[in-house]
UniProtKB/Swiss-Prot annotation:
Record protein name field: Ubiquitin-like protein 5
Alphabetized GO MF terms: protein tag activity
PANTHER family: UBIQUITIN-LIKE PROTEIN 5
Domain of life: Eukaryota
PROSITE patterns in alphabetical order: UBIQUITIN_2 (PS50053)
Gene field: ubl-5
Length: 73
């Protein structure tokens, strides 16, 4: 299990525990469960990289303590 921080830059900061084998789509569903938004509306970015739903955290080399930027579409 790794812990990831998600910040929407509007004051909401969420910590999520997940497995490295989880996909970005799975992570979005965990974020949606904690924030109360629909997972389809969540966009995860870091700088200018937009993370795709079907790729795993391990493939993106996301590790313990990683910070995502949370956007809504």
């Amino acid at each position: 299990m790794i812990e990831i921080t998600v910040n929407d830059r509007l004051g909401k900061k969420v910590r999520i525990k997940c497995n490295p084998s989880d996909t970005i789509g799975d992570l979005k569903k965990l974020i949606a469960a904690q924030t109360g938004t629909r997972w389809e509306k969540i966009v995860l970015k870091k700088w200018y990289t937009i993370y795709k739903d079907h790729i795993t955290l391990m493939d993106y080399e996301i590790h313990e303590g990683f910070n995502f930027e949370l956007y809504y579409q």
